[in-house]
Design a protein with these regions (language model features):
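Charge-dense, helix-prone N-terminal extensions
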Residues: 1-93
């Protein structure tokens, strides 16, 4: 069952930016296809996903959607798609 705050944010996004809404929905579906029992909640203005710990967030901006990884520094990135130069966090712009 989808959390009320998740549903509300999705409705708001669909009303204000349908293109970003479709992209966010595709990313959410991809996440659930890999981690079907992931928990999702609204945090920091986006969608945060967790299992035993938080593993990513999906954020819709005016010009793009960002998939952010709190420990992205630990991810293999053979194709160089991760952005960010901080100590831990990395993101992908879509």
């Amino acid at each position: 069952m989808t959390d009320y705050n998740v549903s509300r944010l999705l409705q708001e996004l669909q009303a204000t930016n349908p293109e970003r809404y479709e992209l966010v929905q595709a990313v959410r579906q991809a996440i659930y296809s890999v981690v079907p029992d992931a928990e999702e909640r609204v945090m920091y203005g986006g969608f945060m996903f967790s299992g035993e710990a938080q593993f990513c967030g999906v954020f819709a901006y005016r010009e793009h959607v960002s998939v952010e990884f709190g420990r992205g520094c630990d991810l293999d990135d053979p194709h160089g798609v991760l952005e960010g130069s901080g100590k831990l966090r990395r993101h992908i712009r879509l």
